[in-house]
Amino acid sequence: MNILVTGGAGYIGSVLVEILLRNNFNVTVLDSFLYKQKSLDKLNNDPCLKIIKGDVRDEKIIKDLVPKCDIVIPLAALVGAPLCETRPQEAKEVNLDSISLLKSKLTKNQRVILPVSNSGYGIGKPGEFCTEESPLNPISLYGRTKVKSESIIMERDNSVSFRLATDRKSVV
């Protein structure tokens, strides 16, 4: 099984790539290496790993990579509200437009697994945990791009979205 992971050198991506390789998947990582990450260095010699330095907004790269995979896991993003607010156009292009581009190159048999940040939930009700059924009320550009990307991907069959939420207890 061939899997394309965009943003595969990022925090979640690098952990996921290692797990996929351990389970004998062929993995292609597309990452811009914006922060010069070294997270995949220890996996460089794995014959099942192919690393492409490139931009998820580059139609030529996407057109070349997508037909070679069975599953796409789009993790590439400008992450976090502060970064997205200071670079709104780039946030829209990377977090949202690249998802539309990716979707346009998929066949009906290819699957997509899309995790969505807890930023999609916005501010929840005090004392209540978010669930898959909780309303999505993003309060930041980052959250809005992630929610919209989910709706774009979920318009097609063979797609799964995982809404990720965290619960932090404060010491104070």
Walk through the language-model features, giving the residues of each.
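N-terminal Rossmann/SDR dinucleotide-binding element
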Residues: 1-71, 80
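SDR active-site strand-loop-helix element
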Residues: 6, 30, 72-76, 112-118, ...
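Short beta->alpha connector loops of Rossmann-like oxidoreductase domains
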Residues: 36-37, 79-83, 121-123, 168
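Conserved cofactor-binding/catalytic machinery of classical short-chain dehydrogenase/reductase
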Residues: 58, 90, 97-101, 111, ...
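Conserved Rossmann-fold NAD(P)-dependent oxidoreductase catalytic core, especially the SDR/UDP-sugar
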Residues: 74, 100-141
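Short alpha-helical oligomerization interface
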Residues: 81-98, 130-137
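Conserved beta-loop-beta element that borders a ligand/cofactor-binding pocket
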Residues: 112, 116-117, 150-172
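Active-site Tyr-X1-5-Lys
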Residues: 123-126, 137-160
